[in-house]
Regions:
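One-carbon transfer enzymes
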Residues: 1-236
C-alpha cells in the first residue's frame, strides 16, 4: 500500500516512523505544508494519512487515493473539532478522546472509523491531557491499522446536533482573563488548568497596564504514606 503522510507534530512523527517499519506499507512522501500537496496528484497513492496536519485539504486532493484519506484527531468527535482539543474538555466539560475518521471538505467532520474516550481528572492541566491524548492516538491508530490495511472498515456518520468547533482565535480569547468577569470558582479553576502548559505562557490578566501570566497546580490530598487521605484530624 502506497501512502502519502500529512503531519508535523510529535505524535505524527511517531506514527510516521511506525508506518515506515511495516512490511506492506510504502510511505512515499511526507507532507508538512500546503504547497507540497501536489505530490499526491503526481504519485497517486492508495491512501492519505493525516496526523497533526493543520490545513484544510482540497477536495481534488482527497479524491486521488483509491482508499481515501484518513485523519487522526485528538478529540472525541463530534466534540472539539478544530484547534486545541486538549483545552476544551477541561473548560467546557465535553468528553475527551481521540478519533480516526475519513477526511472530507471540512475540518474533522468525516465518517468515524474508530474512537475512544480518555478519562480526565480535576487535577489535570492542558499539558496532562495533551500527553494522555497523544498516548491514546498512537494506541488507537496501531490497533485499527490492520482493518485499514485490509480495507475492512465500518464507519459511523458523525452526529452534528451535539458537535463543537474551536478556532485559534477561540484559544487566544480564552487566554485573556477578564478581572471584572463574574464566574464560579470551579469555572475559573477549569480555565486556568486547561491553559496551564509549561513552559508556555498562556493565561494572563492585565492589571494597571501590566500583563501577568497565570498557571495553576492542583494536587489531590494524600496522607503521610502517599495514599489518598480520607480526612484530617488535628489534636491540640
Amino acid at each position: 500500500m502506497d501512502v502519502v503522510f500529512l503531519g508535523i507534530n510529535n505524535i505524527g512523527m511517531k506514527i510516521y516512523n511506525w508506518l515506515c517499519q511495516r512490511n506492506k506499507v510504502d510511505v512515499i512522501a511526507m507532507v508538512t505544508e500546503m504547497e507540497q500537496l501536489d505530490i499526491v496528484q503526481k504519485e497517486s497513492p492508495d491512501l492519505i494519512i493525516s496526523v497533526g496536519f493543520e490545513h484544510l485539504v482540497p477536495a481534488e486532493i482527497l479524491a486521488v487515493p483509491s482508499e481515501g484519506a484518513i485523519n487522526l484527531h485528538p478529540s472525541y468527535l463530534p466534540y472539539n473539532r478544530g484547534m486545541s482539543p486538549n483545552v476544551w474538555p477541561l473548560i467546557e466539560g465535553t468528553p475527551a478522546g481521540v478519533t480516526l475518521h475519513y477526511m472530507d471538505e471540512e475540518f474533522d467532520t468525516g465518517d468515524i472509523i474508530a474512537q475512544q474516550k480518555v478519562q480526565t481528572e480535576f487535577s489535570d492541566t492542558g499539558k496532562d491531557l495533551h500527553s494522555r491524548l497523544e498516548d491514546a492516538q498512537f494506541e488507537l491508530f496501531t490497533q485499527t491499522w490492520p482493518k485499514i490495511e485490509s480495507s475492512n472498515i465500518e464507519t459511523t456518520p458523525q452526529e452534528d446536533t451535539e458537535g463543537t468547533y474551536h478556532t485559534t482565535a477561540d484559544f487566544v480569547d480564552a487566554c485573556e482573563l477578564n478581572p471584572e468577569r463574574e464566574v464560579t470558582i470551579k469555572e475559573f479553576l477549569n480555565t486556568l488548568r486547561a491553559l496551564t502548559f509549561p513552559p508556555f505562557d498562556n493565561a494572563y490578566v492585565e492589571i494597571d497596564g501590566t500583563r501577568y501570566y497565570v498557571d495553576i497546580e492542583i494536587r489531590e490530598e494524600t496522607d503521610e504514606s502517599g495514599d489518598k487521605a480520607e480526612g484530617l484530624v488535628s489534636s491540640y
